[in-house]
Design a protein with these regions (language model features):
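Short active-site oxyanion
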Residues: 8, 61, 87-89
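Conserved GTP-binding G-domain of TRAFAC-class P-loop NTPases and closely related GTPase folds
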Residues: 1-11, 16, 27-28, 83, ...
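Short hydrophobic/aromatic-enriched beta-strand-loop microsegments
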Residues: 32-35, 85-87, 112
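Alpha-helical elements of Rossmann-like donor-binding domains used by nucleotide-donor carbohydrate transfer enzymes
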Residues: 50-51, 76, 120, 124
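Mid-chain, well-packed structural core segment of small domains
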Residues: 70-103
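Conserved substrate/cofactor phosphate-moiety recognition/catalytic segment
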Residues: 11, 16-72
Length: 160
């Protein structure tokens, strides 16, 4: 059992640090669900949602490690969290296209995404907001020392 059931949604471009952040900061106490783990599945969205629902029903925290660029991807996840009484936390990785393309170019095999895929995600990428249904939002950036800087995002209307 957990004190607070949580669904974490990572939001950002490919090669923005989401998976590294996930494994360093969340994987110890969250089930990691990523469509990358079942690329050959016939219905990856359906499989992802089944895993999310099963974990939350078992009172297990979940992190969804995909690009999740827009409300179209968030809404079903936020809905699942609500059904199970979970808090929805968004981790926003602001786009840095040149750096993401450089990191992506250094990847090998199936982990490398064609550049057109990164550009397509950038076109759809939207900063998450509390009005989208998130209970908490954080902005995640590289700290320049091999780690991450995580800062709470203020509610809309109160941004510095």
């Amino acid at each position: 059992m957990v004190d607070e059931l949580e669904l974490a949604i990572l939001i950002g471009l490919q090669a923005s640090g989401k998976t590294t952040f996930c494994h360093r900061m969340l994987a110890d106490d969250h089930l990691v669900v990523s469509k990358d783990a079942f690329r050959n599945a016939r219905h990856p969205q359906r499989r992802q949602m089944r895993l999310v629902h099963e974990a939350l029903a078992a009172r297990r925290c979940v992190v969804v490690d995909n690009t999740n660029p827009s409300p179209q991807e968030w809404e079903p996840l936020i809905g699942a969290a609500r059904v199970h009484g979970a808090v929805t936390v968004g981790y926003w990785f602001p786009p840095d296209l040149p750096a993401a393309l450089d990191r992506n170019a250094a990847r090998e095999g199936r982990s490398r995404v064609p550049d057109v895929g990164v550009y397509d995600t950038l076109k759809r990428l939207r900063r998450p907001r509390y009005v989208d249904g998130f209970d908490r939002l954080y902005e995640v950036r590289f700290d320049g020392k091999g780690g991450f800087r995580v800062e709470p995002m203020p509610p809309e209307g109160r941004q510095p």
